[in-house]
Amino acid sequence: MKKKNILIIAALIVSICNAQTPKTEPYVPETPLWPKNTPNNWPIYHLVHPTFSYDSPFDPNPAFFYKGRYHLHYIYKNEAGFSFAHVSSKDMVHWKWHPTVLAPPTTGHGMFSGTGFFTKDGQPAIVYCGWSSKRNWIQYALDDDLNKWSKPQVMLPKGKDGKFIENVPYFDPDIWLNGNTYYGVNGVSSDDPPQIMKSENLKDWILIGDLLHPDFDEKKLGVKKSEDISCPNMFKLGKKWVLVCISHRLGCRYFIGDFKDEQFLPEYHALLGGNSKRYFAPESLLTPDGRRVNWTWFHGGEVQGTQSLPTELELPSDGILRIRPIKELQSLRYDKQTRKKLIVKKDTSVMLEKIKGDHLELKVVVKDTGEHNFGVDVLCDEQGREGLRINVNREKNLLEVGDEKAPLMLKKGQALTLRIFIDATLVEVFANERQIIMTDKPRGAEARINDGVALFSQGKDIKIDKIIAWKMKSAYAGD
């Protein structure tokens, strides 16, 4: 009888435990899909996340060109936690979503900021911060579509004493190949210096020390050495090395320099995207024809997960970084309109007839920029009001787009070409391939669409030598 009671009690305990333990279903990777009917305030040629996410950020992450397709990952948070969405494209314009396979159920941790790189054997690999793991991790692609990945391999360096360095906050890594040696960086979001390490096989890492060389010249560069370096991406551009990253205080920025004693010694520093902290978390890849193409996350956009246009970075022999939209975007153009030799009287605004729309590309050419302010109002009403102002501020040597601003040095009489991309509420402006500003003019999904374009001048007449406008097709009509 006692044995029978014991068995009954044991069975009851097992039953209670099973009832209190939640059932875990096998993880089925979701595939985000572009909605059939999107609200009219959604972009149609910027990459955005099309489905619900429980949280931000949406940093662009591992990017590759592999087996005829471009691949880009970005962070979002689904029911499983922080994951890497995966999109691919033949041209960096028309994207399709893959199953979200890089997620906590398959890796054992959340997926946070990192980068992509190729091994010495040409195999795509990713390095990233494992959310909640306090470690950085490496995984290797196991198929041509980048839908299958190896198990995570920890990236943990040893110090000079041969012991693993464990009690360090590991965060925002990057890996690149220089010669026959892999170098890796552990980014920081504090005053602690980012660390650089090296490996011959991606498994055995040796700490070198601080990423930034002791000869870092704060006065020359105009920035403190202690400014945080998050979302780092290091690559060779021309004959120099470039580090793009963010500072949580300053926003997106870049250094140009060289390596000395296996540490990075910058010669130049500037912000990328002006004073905007919304142009965030850069990530780049190398195209088959040798172009370096960069994306950033546009923080706080009307639609979650908005990425900047893919932007080519070039460093010619003059050492000045060139920033331009990729040529592949031209495939979306139609209904070309051209106007030449337009005179805008001082302190007036001129509406452009038949040039209007909220999905446009504009090219504005001014051969003599003079000494007075002028510019373009976009997304304005029929009277040229209530628009987003793009102001060439000659008095302060600034490019101002809405509330955002960036330095724009023009000599007296120097020519200027503005490339302006309007995509629903988004406005992205490139100036002389030297500056980029991205902002938006929010509107509700059912709100009236103001889509006018006007030219203005302040203080003196200005001659607009040429303005070309194209309407832009949707990039989501097919792959």
PLM regions and their residue ranges:
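Hydrophobic h-region of N-terminal signal peptides that target proteins for export
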Residues: A10-N18
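Beta-rich carbohydrate-recognition and catalytic domains
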Residues: Q20-K224, K236-N275, T296-K340, D377-L379, ...
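Functional cores that coordinate and move charged inorganic groups
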Residues: E227-F235
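Beta-rich accessory regions
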Residues: T31-L33, D258-K277, E283-D479
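Short, well-structured alpha-helical interface segments that form or flank functional binding sites
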Residues: F58, I229, Y279
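Sec-dependent signal peptide recognition
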Residues: K2-I9
